[in-house]
Structures are given as structure tokens and as C-alpha cells.
């Protein structure tokens, strides 16, 4: 039973480390651009969009669809980068456990 107690302590320690890492992720940001930098989206590590910057050069009232496409592209790229950041930061906890989609 000694091993079981050690294992429980280890799991509790790992859980605390994971919670700390998740809190730290909230403070991290990623930035993605589209249209050669015409649209920039900044997202937090917990997938909140924090900022959207649009160059005046891309604002064309006759082509709103292009602007919408650039915003979507930059937003999706930012969220992809967040997923990569989460995998990098949290993957160390699930390494070798084969738990796809956990984070």
C-alpha cells in the first residue's frame, strides 16, 4: 500500500502543476496576421480574442467580404497558435499517456 500512497501524492502534485500551468497559459498571448499584416489578431492562452487590428489600407466599403475573410483567417491562425501553445505547455503532463484532445 506504500506505493499506492506515493502514487496518490504524485498525482496530487501533478494536478497542482497542471493547474498552475493552466493559469500561466491565461497570461500568455499569441499573435497572428493575415493579408501580409493587414489584419492582426491577438489571443490569450485560454482562447480569448484580446485584440483585432485592421490596417486602414484594407478597409474598402466596396469589398467588405475580403476584410471579413482576412479577419477570419487571422483569428483561425491565432487559435491554431493557441492550440500549439497549449500542447507545448500542457503536453509534458500527458506525454506517453495517449490522451488525444485532452487540452
Swiss-Prot record:
Major subcellular site: cytoplasm
One Gene Ontology term of the molecular function aspect: DNA binding
Region span, Disordered: 1-29
Domain of life: Bacteria
Positions of disulphide bridges: none
Record localization: Cytoplasm, Nucleoid
GO cellular component, one term: cytosol
Regions of compositional bias (Low complexity) in chain numbering: 1-20
InterPro entries to which the protein is assigned, alphabetical: YbaB-like_sf, YbaB/EbfC
Annotated keywords: Cytoplasm, DNA-binding
Pfam families associated with the record: YbaB_DNA_bd (PF02575)
Quaternary context: Homodimer.
Task of the protein: Binds to DNA and alters its conformation. May be involved in regulation of gene expression, nucleoid organization and DNA protection.
Membership in a protein family: Belongs to the YbaB/EbfC family.
Protein name as catalogued: Nucleoid-associated protein BH0035
Organism of origin: Halalkalibacterium halodurans (strain ATCC BAA-125 / DSM 18197 / FERM 7344 / JCM 9153 / C-125) (Bacillus halodurans)
Amino acid at each position: 500500500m506504500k506505493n499506492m500512497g506515493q502514487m496518490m501524492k504524485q498525482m496530487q502534485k501533478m494536478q497542482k502543476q497542471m493547474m498552475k500551468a493552466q493559469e500561466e497559459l491565461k497570461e500568455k498571448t499569441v499573435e497572428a496576421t493575415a493579408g501580409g499584416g493587414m489584419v492582426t489578431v491577438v489571443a490569450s492562452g485560454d482562447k480569448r480574442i484580446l485584440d483585432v487590428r485592421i490596417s486602414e489600407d484594407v478597409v474598402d466599403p466596396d469589398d467588405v467580404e475580403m476584410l471579413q475573410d482576412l479577419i477570419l483567417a487571422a483569428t483561425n491562425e491565432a487559435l491554431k497558435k493557441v492550440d500549439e501553445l497549449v500542447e507545448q505547455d500542457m503536453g509534458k503532463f500527458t506525454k506517453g499517456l495517449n490522451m488525444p484532445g485532452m487540452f
